[in-house]
């Protein structure tokens, strides 16, 4: 096997994820020679704005995809939730490895459970999806935007006027934070995850047979089916970062997929949700999307997209 170059965002989390995946590859192919090339993306350069205000899909992947096309790198290791639902022609997701915990972590300054926070408590999050679901369940709380990496957010929780913050459990775990700092992991009934949350997507050129053969050795087919249902739903709903959208699929021992799709307004007041079981992930994603459109969810998406 030739020497491989892996493209990664420059953040600590991205580099850690990349190294962890490289270790996984070396476990099945010990003689691999792999180097990481750090790439700065548009999303990394914008640190002072709410990402949904910046607009556009693929804020964290476009520059990396460009490097793949230019053959400066052989593969890219993305957080799947950052990858738009349509992959450019000539590129492919070569594998979906094992999924980390897909839920969100709730961290309270005083370790107060979410349901017991006093009225007017301020929760920091960078996601419309989290904000909308929290306001829907706990309209007495306030949402305040927070940006920055995990360390920055944990520091802001202590030094600024946040009572709690919510962030992806997967990032905390991959960075080696212990469960001690987490007040609770929020289950799907409290906070339905983002599309592809906790999963990685390994992107490469579609014609790179040698690499695709290697990647197939660390591919998790069950996770791939689940995230395919989620990403199909995202594509069908035309969900952009202006829309609070969530979707989560699980697979049973009998290989049946259960998928829940959710669309909300940012204030949490309108909620469209549907759960369905099936065996074909693409059909499942499409059908749940159609059900939500019948309920009126598409009107919300059109309205929110037009406002930006």
Curated annotation (Swiss-Prot):
Originating organism: Staphylococcus aureus (strain JH9)
Comment field (misc): The porphobilinogen subunits are added to the dipyrromethane group.
The keyword Chloroplast appears for this protein: no
Coiled coil, from the record: none
Database matches in NCBIfam families: hemC
Listed name of the protein: Porphobilinogen deaminase
Pathway assigned in UniProt: Porphyrin-containing compound metabolism; protoporphyrin-IX biosynthesis; coproporphyrinogen-III from 5-aminolevulinate: step 2/4
HAMAP family hit by this protein: Porphobil_deam (MF_00260)
Oligomer and partners: Monomer.
InterPro entries: HemC, Porphobilin_deaminase_cofac_BS, Porphobilin_deaminase_N, Porphobilinogen_deaminase_C, Porphobilinogen_deaminase_C_sf
Gene3D superfamilies recorded: Periplasmic binding protein-like II (3.40.190.10), Porphobilinogen deaminase, C-terminal domain (3.30.160.40)
Domain of life (superkingdom): Bacteria
EC number, as in UniProt: 2.5.1.61
Function: Tetrapolymerization of the monopyrrole PBG into the hydroxymethylbilane pre-uroporphyrinogen in several discrete steps.
Record family assignment: Belongs to the HMBS family.
Gene Ontology CC annotation, any one: cytoplasm
EC class (word): transferase
Annotated GO MF terms: hydroxymethylbilane synthase activity
Cofactor binding, note field: Binds 1 dipyrromethane group covalently.
CDD domains noted in UniProt: PBP2_EcHMBS_like (cd13646)
SUPFAM superfamilies per record: Periplasmic binding protein-like II, Porphobilinogen deaminase (hydroxymethylbilane synthase), C-terminal domain
One example of a Gene Ontology biological process annotation: protoporphyrinogen IX biosynthetic process
């Amino acid at each position: 096997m030739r020497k491989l170059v892996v493209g990664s965002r420059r953040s600590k989390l991205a580099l850690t994820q990349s190294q962890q995946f490289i270790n996984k590859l070396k476990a099945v192919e010990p003689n691999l020679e792999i180097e990481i090339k750090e790439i700065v993306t548009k999303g990394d350069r914008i640190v002072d704005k709410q990402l949904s205000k910046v607009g556009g899909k693929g804020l964290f992947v476009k520059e990396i995809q460009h490097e793949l096309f230019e053959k400066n790198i052989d593969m890219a290791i993305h957080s799947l939730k950052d990858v738009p639902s349509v992959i450019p022609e000539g590129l492919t997701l070569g594998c979906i490895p094992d999924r980390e915990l897909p839920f969100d972590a709730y961290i309270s300054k005083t370790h107060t459970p979410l349901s017991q926070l006093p009225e007017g408590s301020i929760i920091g999050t960078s996601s419309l999806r989290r904000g909308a679901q929290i306001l829907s369940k706990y309209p007495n709380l306030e949402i305040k935007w927070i940006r920055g990496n995990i360390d920055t957010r944990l520091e802001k929780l202590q030094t600024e006027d946040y009572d709690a913050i919510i962030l992806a459990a997967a990032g905390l775990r991959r960075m080696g934070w212990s469960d001690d700092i987490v007040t609770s992991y929020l289950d799907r009934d409290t906070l339905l995850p983002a599309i592809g949350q906790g999963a990685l997507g390994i992107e490469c050129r579609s014609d790179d047979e040698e690499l695709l053969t290697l990647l197939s050795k660390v591919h998790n087919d069950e996770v791939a089916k689940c995230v395919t249902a989620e990403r199909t739903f995202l594509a069908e709903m035309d969900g952009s970062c202006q829309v609070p959208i969530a979707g989560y699929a699980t697979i049973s021992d009998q290989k049946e997929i259960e998928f829940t799709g959710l669309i909300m307004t940012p204030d949490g007041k309108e909620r469209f949700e549907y759960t369905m079981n099936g065996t074909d992930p693409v059909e499942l994603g499409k059908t749940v999307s159609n059900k939500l459109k019948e309920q009126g969810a598409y009107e919300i998406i059109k309205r929110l997209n037009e406002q930006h």
